[in-house]
């Protein structure tokens, strides 16, 4: 009997977890994409949220997640994911990951963020990649241009115009925060495959919810000042020393408060001068800031909100299946209602591990087989991506209203860019227009309150 071939697009935490779990079950696995160090998982500083400490519980973590998500989370999904926290922890530690401490972050009732010197991704990703290679996972470097689908049936993926045939494909290529002008994530995370599968009949979910990290630092490039710095006691202040927000509120509230102060013409700073042993607790941030001429033990740190995490994505079920047989999505590429309207800090790495393990079980159970051997190929070039970034930043950013969103739609029509990227941007704007309320990461100044009639997820169907 021939081995089942599984192609995983993306080598971040979700992709590597799925690859290892599938390879351990005997599947022929390939990871297709850039180096794993070019993933947002690798950049993850704080850590992974796990309710494993004394006094904490799955129930409390679930309640924190739903409160942060402003009550439109899929509660069954939230329970499913968080109840697998011990399995996620055991998977990581059994493969050589050693956590060095626990931190408190905004929205959490307990210091349940398991971290590795606040450089968690840089430690986890190389360890898992080493294990994947030892299991003979095939790493194919390159840019997946599109998913090969023929009349609703999966054929594989296209790499430089060549169809690589697989029985199952798992999209683990991250979200689309790179479609915003300012992001601390990987700039290549532009959601191309999210738009690709949408054009081919897969609905998108909750696309209006884009999370902005409150404390980005723009220097030689854009960096994140991890939430854990505020958890350790850093304060947010204006240039004249005014404190204006609870630093440990959820990210949507803090980001919006900072943005409003900036609209008043006030600079906003992070004051970390009261943190003892900053250099030892946050070595990466310390080295970055010193390289930019700032000593966080003596100086205020200028910050700005930046696009950080896209809550919406490819609509999947509890088993990470799309509506196309053999096609799955996990991690930030996917959306099944876990985060609701706003992601609780450090829940993303938990979702990456859990979704990677769960999709491996799903594929092992269903054993899909490729039914077609070819598919149409249409990729040419990406086009004017920077203009999309400007439109989304200016018209579908931290604060929105009907006029600005409609103006963004108008500008979008004039941009010469790959239709799939235009579709992702259109999904964000139209979903934001339809949600005539403010909830979580989506804030409409013309509808500044939550409304009961919008207490549900949104779905975007490109052909409707």
From Swiss-Prot:
Q: Where is the signal peptide?
A: none
**Where does this protein act, in terms of pathway?**
Cofactor biosynthesis; NAD(+) biosynthesis; iminoaspartate from L-aspartate (oxidase route): step 1/1
Q: Which cofactor does it need?
A: FAD
Which EC class is the enzyme in? oxidoreductase
The cross-references to InterPro entries, in alphabetical order and at most eight, read: FAD-dep_OxRdtase_2_FAD-bd, FAD/NAD-bd_sf, Fum_R/Succ_DH_flav-like_C_sf, Fum_Rdtase/Succ_DH_flav-like_C, NadB, Succ_DH/fumarate_Rdtase_cat_sf
- Its catalytic activity? L-aspartate + O2 = iminosuccinate + H2O2
Q: Which Gene3D superfamilies match?
A: FAD/NAD(P)-binding domain, Fumarate reductase/succinate dehydrogenase flavoprotein-like, C-terminal domain, Succinate dehydrogenase/fumarate reductase flavoprotein, catalytic domain
Query: Mainly localized where?
Result: cytoplasm
Protein keywords: Cytoplasm, FAD, Flavoprotein, Nucleotide-binding, Oxidoreductase, Pyridine nucleotide biosynthesis
Q: Which GO terms describe its molecular function?
A: L-aspartate oxidase activity; nucleotide binding
The name this protein carries in UniProt is L-aspartate oxidase
Q: Where in the cell is it found?
A: Cytoplasm
Query: Which amino acid positions bind FAD, per UniProt?
Result: 11-14, 40-47, 332, 348-349
**Described function:** Catalyzes the oxidation of L-aspartate to iminoaspartate, the first step in the de novo biosynthesis of NAD(+).
Q: List, alphabetically, the GO terms of the cellular component aspect.
A: cytoplasm
In its UniProt record, which GO terms are filed under biological process? NAD biosynthetic process
The keyword Cytoplasm is assigned to this record = yes
> What does the cofactor section's free text say about binding?
Binds 1 FAD per subunit.
- Active site at 251
Marked site positions, Important in orienting the L-aspartate substrate: 105
């Amino acid at each position: 009997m021939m081995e089942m071939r599984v192609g995983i697009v993306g080598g971040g935490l979700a992709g590597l977890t799925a690859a290892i779990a599938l390879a351990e079950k005997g599947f022929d696995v390939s990871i297709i994409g850039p180096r794993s160090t070019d993933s947002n998982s690798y950049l993850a500083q704080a850590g992974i949220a796990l309710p494993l400490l004394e006094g904490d519980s799955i129930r409390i973590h679930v309640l924190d997640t739903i409160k942060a998500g402003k009550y439109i989370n899929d509660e069954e999904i939230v329970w499913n994911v968080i109840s697998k926290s011990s399995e996620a922890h055991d998977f990581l530690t059994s493969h050589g990951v050693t956590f060095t401490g626990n931190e408190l972050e905004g929205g959490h009732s307990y210091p349940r963020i398991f971290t590795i010197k606040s450089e968690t991704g840089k430690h986890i990703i190389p360890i898992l990649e080493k294990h994947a290679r030892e299991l003979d996972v095939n790493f194919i470097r390159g840019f997946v241009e599109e998913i090969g689908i023929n009349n609703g049936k999966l054929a594989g993926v296209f790499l430089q115009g060549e169809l690589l045939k697989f029985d199952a494909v798992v999209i683990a290529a991250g979200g689309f925060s790179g479609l915003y002008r300012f992001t601390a994530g990987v700039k290549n995370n532009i959601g191309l495959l999210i738009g690709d599968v949408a054009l081919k009949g897969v609905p998108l979910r909750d696309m209006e919810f884009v999370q902005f990290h409150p404390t980005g630092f723009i220097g030689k490039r854009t960096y994140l000042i991890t939430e854990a710095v505020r958890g350790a006691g850093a304060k947010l202040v204006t240039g004249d020393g005014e404190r204006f927000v609870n630093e440990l509120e959820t990210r949507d509230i803090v980001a919006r408060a900072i943005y409003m102060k900036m609209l008043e013409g006030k600079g906003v700073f992070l004051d970390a001068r009261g943190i003892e042993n900053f250099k030892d607790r946050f070595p990466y941030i310390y080295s970055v800031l010193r390289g930019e001429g700032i000593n966080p033990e003596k100086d205020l740190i200028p910050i700005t909100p930046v696009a950080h995490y896209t809550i919406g994505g490819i609509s999947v079920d509890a088993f990470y299946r799309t509506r196309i047989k053999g096609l799955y999505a996990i991690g930030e590429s996917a959306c099944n209602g876990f985060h609701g309207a706003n992601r609780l800090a450090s829940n993303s790495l938990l979702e990456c591990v859990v979704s990677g393990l769960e999709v491996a079980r799903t594929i092992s159970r269903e054993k899909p087989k490729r039914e077609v051997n070819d598919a149409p190929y249409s990729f040419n070039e990406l086009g004017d991506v920077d203009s999309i970034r400007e439109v989304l930043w200016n018209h579908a950013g931290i604060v929105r209203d009907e006029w600005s969103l409609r103006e963004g739609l108008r500008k979008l029509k004039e941009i010469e860019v790959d239709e799939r990227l235009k579709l992702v941007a259109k999904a964000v704007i139209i979903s934001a227009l339809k949600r005539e309320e403010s909830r979580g990461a989506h804030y409409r100044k013309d509808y500044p309150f939550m409304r009961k009639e919008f207490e549900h997820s949104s779905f975007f169907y490109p052909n409707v």
